[in-house]
Swiss-Prot record:
Motif mapping: 'KMSKS' region: 271-275
Keyword ATP-binding among record annotations: yes
Catalysis performed (reactions): tRNA(Gln) + L-glutamine + ATP = L-glutaminyl-tRNA(Gln) + AMP + diphosphate
Family from the record: Belongs to the class-I aminoacyl-tRNA synthetase family.
Protein name: Glutamine--tRNA ligase
Chain location of the short sequence motif 'HIGH' region per the record: 35-45
NCBIfam families, A to Z: glnS (TIGR00440), PRK14703.1 (NF011291)
Keywords for this protein: Aminoacyl-tRNA synthetase, ATP-binding, Cytoplasm, Ligase, Nucleotide-binding, Protein biosynthesis
Binding residue positions for ATP: E36, P37, N38, H42, I43, G44, H45, A46, K47, S48, T232, R264, L265
Stored PROSITE patterns: AA_TRNA_LIGASE_I
Keyword Protein biosynthesis part of the UniProt annotation: yes
Binding site for L-glutamine: D68, Y213
Organism: Neisseria gonorrhoeae (strain ATCC 700825 / FA 1090)
UniProt cross-references to CDD domains, sorted A to Z: GlnRS_core
Length: 562
């Protein structure tokens, strides 16, 4: 359930919007989230989703979902459907039907013809290599193309023939006629159409020319009546072109949008480059785009992150124009905080040590009911069964305990969570000297009450061996061992492959034992394993006969670089 307190406040974009509404510049807020359907959304997109949809929600406006699909070779319906699912999972709903930039291809073409007629666009025959030479540098002005002064009639004829497929791919482009000496290289006669025979996921084979992003984006905003077009800071240098295109198409003046930029999110210990994420998938460093170690929304969902937790993280990351570098612990902290309130509890033992209760008596030794959550009675309770053999965590026992150790030791006592106080009477070892079993006695007068005359400080979790559910547990950790895996240089000054810094211990699969309540859980069921961490039944692999739990996050932030 959304509420207006869930979104970042007191940032400069909210100030702009409030001033615009107060002055009457806009009667209502209209934003958009415009992903390119060429990959899966990641945590950086989640921040943008929360910003655009959140602002529309806060100010009772609307937010469109628009696919910027101008690059047909890299785009497909798989990504379209995945993006829609991710946005909905985060808790947002777009205005009307999803929109596509390709829905506007006819209008984009007509506007380009209008620019040619106004002498503001021309067909160019320069090759990509020649165009780079003519463009100049940051310190040197560019040169006019020898085709820049073609007549309007010739340009109209050539552009029509480009559309009709009379020229080879890449042989001609349509460029805006702006200023080859402009200090901003983006304004040096940018290309707005290129010839590319490629099947398009939405328009099929209707077109063999496709518009460029910078031309398409601003026009799409205007067509949809977007009031505040929000993008990350790398597009700040593109804003003059955004404005130029809209200023020079009179039909769009009535719905003139404005572009505002904010800093993109850089999350440490991961990467968000689609190219690099794709490399991880292709080279099988991960199991897929939804691998729980990936920073994709689908990966985070499978990891057990909640929409509420991701929205809380986006709020804490904030919106500004300054560098937005955020440690992974901030994301994990937001998820941990949300799950602390929402996740019911179970006990599970990941590294079992057998304990025999020597004075167990059927009929006398009793099970006890325990709440699923200490603060939410509505979640109900369950029986925590006990039997003569139980499992505890191996590291909850120490023969030679360190100072301050409050768990089980030879001759010592400890309370079983939701159960009795037990005392260790005998330690059984194998031939190699490894502890394989403890023999302990139960104090039958301690079920639900403290023992008389002594204090037992330690409390440990456990499961009944007779009743336990055998489960598969995947212990996930950070995918990389360094903060910025894509920005590490070698001795020669060149960047090292980011895959050199993959964490070899980013996933470990073990067999564990859990309370019987774990046997019949549906997929994507989130739980706290008491004293261990938060876990989720795997979205893909979990089943009644093969329970699979993914570790979402530990109870505390104890991560150390390997």
């Amino acid at each position: 359930m959304l509420n207006k307190d869930q979104f970042a406040d007191n940032h400069f974009i909210r100030t702009i919007i409030e001033d615009d509404l107060k002055s009457g510049k806009h009667e209502a807020v209209q934003t958009r989230f415009p992903p390119e359907p060429n990959g899966y959304l990641h945590i950086g997109h989640a921040k943008s989703i929360c910003l655009n949809f959140g602002l529309a929600y806060i100010y009772d406006g609307l937010c469109n979902l628009r696919f910027d699909d101008t690059n047909p070779e890299k785009e497909n319906d798989e990504y379209v459907n995945a993006i829609k699912e991710d946005v909905e999972w985060l808790g947002f709903h777009w205005a009307g039907e999803p929109r596509f930039a390709s829905d506007y291809f006819d209008r984009l073409y007509d506007y380009a013809v209008g620019l040619i007629k106004d002498g503001k666009a021309y067909v160019d025959d320069l090759t990509p290599e020649e165009m780079r030479e003519y463009r100049g540098t940051l310190t040197e002005a560019g040169k006019n193309s020898p085709y820049r002064d073609r007549s309007i009639e010739e340009n109209l004829d050539l552009f029509t023939r480009m559309k009709n497929g009379e020229f080879p791919d890449g042989s001609k482009t349509l460029r805006l006629k702006i200023d080859m000496a402009a200090g901003n290289i983006n304004m040096r006669d940018p290309v707005i159409y290129r010839i590319r025979r490629a099947h398009h996921h939405n328009t099929g084979d209707k077109w063999c020319i496709y518009p460029m992003y910078d031309y398409t984006h601003c026009i799409s905003d205007a067509i949809e009546g977007i009031t505040h077009s929000l993008c990350t800071l790398e597009f700040e240098a593109h804003r003059p072109l955004y404005d130029w295109v809209l200023d020079n198409i009179p039909a769009l003046h009535a719905t003139r949008p404005r572009q505002y930029e904010f800093s993109r999110l850089e999350l440490l210990y991961t990467i968000t480059s689609k190219r690099k994420l794709n490399q991880l998938v292709v080279e099988k460093h991960v199991s897929g785009w939804d691998d729980p170690r990936m920073p994709t929304i689908s990966g985070m969902r499978r990891r057990g992150y909640t929409p509420e937790g991701v929205r809380l993280f986006a709020k804490r990351a904030g919106i500004s124009k300054s560098e937005n570098i955020v440690d992974m612990s901030v994301l994990e902290g937001a998820i941990r905080e949300e799950l602390e309130n929402s996740a019911p509890r179970l006990m599970a033992v990941l590294n079992p040590l057998k304990v025999t209760l020597t004075n167990f008596q059927a009929g006398k030794t009793q099970s006890r009911r325990a709440a699923f959550h200490p603060n939410h009675e509505e979640m109900g309770d369950r029986e925590v069964p006990v039997s003569q053999t139980i499992y505890i965590e191996a590291d909850d026992f120490a023969e030679n305990p360190p100072k301050g150790f409050k768990r089980l030791i030879p001759g010592g006592e400890v309370r079983l969570r939701h159960g009795y106080v037990i005392k260790c009477g005998e330690v059984v070892k194998d031939e190699a000297g490894n502890v394989v079993e403890l023999k302990c006695s139960i104090d039958h007068d301690t079920l639900g009450k403290n023992p008389e005359g002594r204090k037992v400080k330690g409390v440990i979790h456990w499961v009944s061996a007779e009743h336990a559910a055998e489960i598969k547990v995947r212990l996930y950790d950070r995918l990389f061992t360094v903060e910025r895996p894509g920005a590490v240089r070698g001795e020669d000054g060149e960047y090292l492959p980011f895959t050199d810094f993959l964490n070899p211990e980013s996933v470990k699969e073990i067999t564990a034992y859990a309370e019987p309540a774990a046997k019949d859980l549906p997929a994507e069921s989130r739980w706290q394993f008491e004293r261990i961490g938060y876990f989720v039944t795997d979205r893909q692999d979990h089943g009644k006969d093969t329970p699979v739990f993914n570790r979402t996050v530990t109870l505390k932030d104890s991560w150390q670089p390997k």
